[in-house]
């Protein structure tokens, strides 16, 4: 007998070699929004609408609208949760959204610890240090977020996938 079930989508935590922490906070947030099992898709849509424009695409119009009661910090952290599907665009969109001057670095730091996504945010902060060392909230996170190593940090985006490359064109300029 052969089972032809699709393979489950790997999670971000599994790709990092960690057990996935299933966030009760994120489950409640998905219910409040009305996104259900499409929470990750809604998060990306909300991040794009709030400024992560590099990841603009056509989203399903049946997704719930953005909810201004949910902060940029919450959307960014939720995109980096270990139980989310392993889609690096989520991490990249979180990096762009959280680079906004609207972000409260101390609040972001508290959320990151509570939701166990310190390795992802510290990876982004390390990339920011190479390009713009004083850029907030990343400078704050490097100083205040406790490090938590993961077995496979190579699963996170290469630094070149987290920065804008100016003066680079398809014609090689």
Language-model features: where?
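Helix-turn-helix/homeodomain-like alpha-helical modules used for DNA recognition
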Residues: 29-98
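Hydrophobic alpha-helical interaction segments
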Residues: 75-173
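Basic, Lys/Arg-rich alpha-helical nucleic-acid-recognition elements, primarily the DNA-binding modules
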Residues: 1-28
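Polar low-complexity intrinsically disordered regions enriched in Ser/Thr and small residues
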Residues: 20, 27, 37-39, 54, ...
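Intrinsic-disorder-associated interaction segments
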Residues: 5, 9, 22, 32-37, ...
């Amino acid at each position: 007998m052969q089972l032809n079930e699709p393979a489950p989508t790997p999670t971000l935590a599994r790709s990092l070699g960690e057990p996935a922490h299933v966030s009760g906070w994120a489950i409640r947030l998905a219910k409040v929004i009305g996104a259900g099992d499409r929470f990750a898709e809604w998060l990306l849509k909300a991040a794009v609408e709030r400024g992560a424009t590099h990841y603009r695409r056509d989203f399903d119009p049946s997704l719930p609208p953005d909810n201004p009661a949910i902060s940029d910090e919450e959307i960014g952290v939720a995109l980096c949760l270990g139980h989310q599907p392993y889609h690096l665009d989520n991490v990249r969109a979180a990096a762009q959204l959280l680079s906004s001057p609207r972000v409260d670095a101390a609040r972001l730091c508290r959320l990151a610890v509570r939701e166990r996504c310190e390795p992802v945010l510290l990876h982004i902060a390390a990339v920011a240090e190479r390009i713009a060392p004083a850029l907030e909230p990343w400078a704050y996170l490097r100083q205040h977020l406790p490090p938590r190593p993961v077995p496979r940090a190579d699963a996170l985006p290469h630094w070149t996938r987290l920065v804008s490359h100016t003066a680079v064109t398809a014609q090689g300029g």
